[in-house]
C-alpha cells in the first residue's frame, strides 16, 4: 500500500504509478464522464465514479488478484479502511471473472481519511474497504486506475 497526494508526488514513487497518476491529472476534469476509460486497453485503464459513502459497518472489504488499484479522490472525502494482514477466505469470490473478492472485513482494520487529491495504491491481495463515510454519508467522485500486474 502507498498513500500520497497527486499534487505532491514523491520522487520514490515507482515510475509506472507516477505516469498513471500524471495521466489522470492531465486528462480527467469535472466533465469527464463516469465509466471506464482506456489508457492502454485492458492492461491500464481507469474508472470514474460518483458514489455515496456509507457507514463503515455497511461496507464490505475487497481485494484483487491481477490488478493494482490507484484510488484517487477527485471531489469529496472518503474513509478508506485497509488491512496489513492476509485476506483469508472470501465469502464472495469473483476473482476469476471480475478480479474481485469480498469479505465482511479485513483483519485488524485501520482507516485513513482521503480528501480531494489524495490517493492510495493497493497491490493485488491487499485488503481494502472503500467508500466508508467520514461522519455522515456524502457523495465522492473518484478515479480508480486499474493496472494489470499478473
Curated annotation (Swiss-Prot):
Entry keywords, A to Z: Acetylation
Family named by the database record: Belongs to the TabA/YiaL family.
One GO biological process term: single-species biofilm formation
Gene3D superfamilies (alphabetical): YhcH/YjgK/YiaL
Traits of the deletion mutant: Deletion increases biofilm formation after 8 hours and decreases biofilm formation after 24 hours.
Function in brief: Influences biofilm formation. Represses fimbria genes in 8 hours biofilms. May act in response to the combined activity of several toxin-antitoxin (TA) systems.
Naturally occurring in which organism (per UniProt): Escherichia coli (strain K12)
A GO-annotated cellular component: cytosol
Name of the protein in question: Toxin-antitoxin biofilm protein TabA
Induction or repression: Induced by simultaneous deletion of five TA systems (MazF/MazE, RelE/RelB, ChpB, YoeB/YefM, and YafQ/DinJ).
Pfam families: DUF386
Record-linked InterPro entries: NanQ/TabA/YiaL, NanQ/TabA/YiaL_sf
Residues bearing the modification N6-acetyllysine: 36
PANTHER family reported in the protein's UniProt record: EVOLVED BETA-GALACTOSIDASE SUBUNIT BETA (PTHR34986), EVOLVED BETA-GALACTOSIDASE SUBUNIT BETA-RELATED (PTHR34986:SF4)
Lineage: Bacteria, Pseudomonadati, Pseudomonadota, Gammaproteobacteria, Enterobacterales
Amino acid at each position: 500500500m502507498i498513500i500520497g497526494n497527486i499534487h505532491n508526488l514523491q520522487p520514490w514513487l515507482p515510475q509506472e504509478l507516477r505516469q498513471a497518476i500524471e495521466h489522470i491529472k492531465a486528462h480527467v476534469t469535472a466533465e469527464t464522464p463516469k465509466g471506464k476509460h482506456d489508457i492502454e486497453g485492458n492492461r491500464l485503464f481507469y474508472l470514474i465514479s460518483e458514489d455515496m459513502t456509507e457507514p463503515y459497518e455497511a461496507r464490505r472489504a475487497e481485494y484483487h488478484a491481477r490488478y493494482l488499484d490507484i484510488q484517487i479522490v477527485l471531489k469529496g472525502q472518503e474513509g478508506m479502511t485497509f488491512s496489513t494482514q492476509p485476506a483469508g477466505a472470501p465469502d464472495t469470490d469473483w476473482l476469476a471473472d471480475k478480479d474481485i473478492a469480498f469479505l465482511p472485513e479485513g483483519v485488524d482494520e485501520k482507516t485513513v481519511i482521503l480528501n480531494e487529491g489524495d490517493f492510495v495504491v493497493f497491490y493485488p491481495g491487499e485488503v481494502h474497504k472503500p467508500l466508508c463515510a467520514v461522519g455522515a454519508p456524502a457523495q465522492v467522485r473518484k478515479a480508480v486506475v486499474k493496472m494489470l500486474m499478473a
